[in-house]
UniProtKB/Swiss-Prot annotation:
The keyword Acetylation applies. Pfam families: DUF4139 (PF13598), DUF4140 (PF13600). The modification N-acetylalanine is found at A2. Keywords: Acetylation. It comes from Caenorhabditis elegans. This is Protein F37C4.5. The keyword Ribosomal protein does not apply. GO terms for cellular component: mitochondrion. NCBIfam families: mucoidy inhibitor MuiA family protein. The lineage of its organism: Eukaryota, Metazoa, Ecdysozoa, Nematoda, Chromadorea.
Length: 556
């Protein structure tokens, strides 16, 4: 082992954070970068970066540098004793805990002392009664007077003491509650049961000595961000959708972040996936039914093939902070996108203390053109919904998260917003439209048989929806139904009515007619005049060999 000529010590939280790259809640981690200067001696130097966070991701530390020096080794070791530094914030919480503990113990001790006084008086009365029975006392007028005085003293004193007990019991319950809260706060710091931490040992060789700059990058767990949207739709001839895009950061890393340049990433580091999964040959064959046995019940057909789904992603590289675009009303985050993820550089430094459940930052604000339409899914809910259809023409990929929806300034509801990458179509439900009445008739099924060599079963399904437009203007209504999607060449599905065209996805601007998506979702759009009541029928036929049984399974 090389001889260390000089050891340099510094505490991690004394080094400013250059950047905090926070990943989504699926990853629950963040990557931090800190840069510091060190004056190296000639030869081998050891730089000890002390008090690494408790939630450090193992093997995530990497060190780079600038200057005339060579980095030979980076390792993580345990540090104990005097070098273990507890942050001031934690010391303050510990002091409160100790104060509440002393207050609780003081009340408990006072109660014990009062209880002992009561027990002493009770024992005195017991002893007097015992000696009276064995003849030790000669009862005369003075004895009776003394006993009466003793009993009176006992009664008055114990009544007062028991009142003190009841008061102390109340004080003790309050003190125990405050102690429990302080104890929980102390537990939450992560420092209560720890007497050691870790440090990074960096071995650096310098040929001539002098100043060098080192950058340490590491990952911590229990940090994440989730998106939140404020979506405001304005109706009218030219409807618009105003979107304000927020990020909510949760920070439980064990260290405080002070004025940190913040970057939010949509990447999902997969720490547990080390290599590309392997696939075997997937063979497909016809299932041959087993002979039926007398088991008192009916046998079923075996199921299909299931695969485990593994999502792989790697962390996007750290990026330099860019200048945010400035606006009179709202700051914006600079966006950097790669093939697998996007990064939002927040426009202002953030101060996020440890144990912060929600720190809200603004990512961006933009306006999208939108088309309003009415949609009903009568098989699920016989009501018409007002829907805003838009295309994400912004620079921001929209990540799935919660959204607050407003229509013309009025709050509609909170909903779960789905992913919408740049240029992707999406829709936002604006609530129920009470001016369009929907009645879904009972589904009618007809069975037919045909064929001479092979018997074919044909099932005709007829779904009828009655609608009434109570608006003073004409409206477009889309009736959304699902048709069976065949996964077997022996199963054939034919749409009888209405006539429909096949499309890759539903149009942003609905038009009169019917369209079928690859998922066999039928959008049947009709025009309704003011006050018009009409009935619309969706009818399709499902054909399959009579000897086979069809199983329907809805997949999203």
């Amino acid at each position: 082992m090389a001889h260390i000529v000089q050891t340099h010590k510094l505490t991690l939280h004394d080094v400013a954070i250059d950047q905090a790259l926070v990943y989504s809640s699926d990853s629950n981690c963040a990557e931090l970068k800190r840069t510091f200067q060190v004056e190296l001696a000639h030869g081998y130097n050891e730089v000890k970066v002390q008090n690494l966070p408790f939630d450090l991701v193992q093997d995530s530390i990497r060190v780079s540098g600038a200057g005339e020096a060579v980095i030979h080794d980076v390792s993580v070791k345990n540090q104990e004793g005097a070098e273990f530094v507890i942050p001031e914030r934690v010391l303050a919480i510990k002091a409160i805990f100790e104060e509440k503990e002393r207050a609780k113990d003081k009340v408990a001790d006072s109660r014990v002392a009062v209880q002992k006084r009561i027990e002493g008086l009770d024992n005195l009365i017991t002893e007097v009664a015992k000696h009276g029975k064995d003849g030790a006392f000669h009862f005369d007028g003075r004895t009776i007077e003394s006993l009466n005085a003793l009993h009176g003293f006992h009664q008055d004193t114990t009544v007062d003491l028991r009142a003190q007990i009841r008061t102390l019991d109340q004080d003790l319950r309050k003190a125990e509650e405050e102690y429990a809260r302080a104890s929980q706060d102390y537990d939450n710091t992560g420092y209560r049961w720890r007497n050691s931490a870790q440090y990074a040992s960096i071995i650096v060789e310098s040929e001539a000595g002098g100043a060098a700059q080192l950058t340490i990058t590491y990952q911590v767990n229990n940090v994440s961000w989730t998106p939140f949207y404020d979506i405001r739709v304005t109706a009218g001839v030219e409807a618009e959708m105003h979107v304000t895009y927020f990020g909510k950061v949760r920070q439980y890393s064990g260290e405080d972040w002070k004025t940190v340049p913040l970057v939010l990433s949509t990447a999902r580091p997969a720490h547990g996936v080390k290599q590309l999964p392997k696939l075997g040959a997937l063979e497909a064959s016809i299932v041959v039914p087993e002979p039926e046995c007398n088991r008192g019940g009916r046998g079923g057909y075996g199921g299909g093939y299931a695969q485990d789904s593994v999502v792989m992603a790697c962390a996007a590289p750290m990026m330099e902070m860019g200048r945010s675009r400035k606006s009179m009303k709202m700051s914006y985050a600079a966006v950097k996108s790669s093939n697998i993820a996007s990064e939002f550089s927040i426009g202002r430094p953030a101060t996020i203390d440890d144990r912060t459940d929600e720190y809200k930052v603004n990512i961006g604000q933009f306006t999208l053109d939108t088309k309003l339409s009415n949609v009903t899914v009568p098989s699920r809910n016989a009501t018409a919904f007002l829907v805003a259809n838009s295309v994400n023409t912004s620079d921001y990929p929209l990540v799935a998260g919660q959204a607050s929806i407003f229509l013309d300034g009025a709050f509609v509801n909170k909903t779960e917003f789905e992913d919408a990458v740049v240029s992707q179509k999406f829709e936002v439900s604006l609530g129920v439209d009470p001016n369009i009445r929907i009645e879904y008739k009972p589904v009618r099924n007809y069975q037919e048989q045909s064929g001479t060599v092979e018997k074919i079963n044909s099932q005709v399904t007829e779904k009828t929806t009655a609608v009434t437009n109570l608006r003073p203007n004409s409206v477009l209504l889309t009736i959304r139904e699902q048709l069976p999607r065949s996964t077997d060449s022996r199963i054939k599905v034919h749409l009888n009515t209405p006539e429909a065209v096949e499309v890759d996805e539903a149009s942003v601007e609905p038009t009169v007619g019917a369209a079928i998506t690859p998922e066999k979702i039928l959008d049947y759009t009709v025009q309704l005049a003011p006050g018009q009541s009409s009935t619309f029928v969706v009818k399709y036929t499902t054909e399959h060999p009579q000897a086979e049984q069809i199983r329907y399974e809805e997949k999203f």
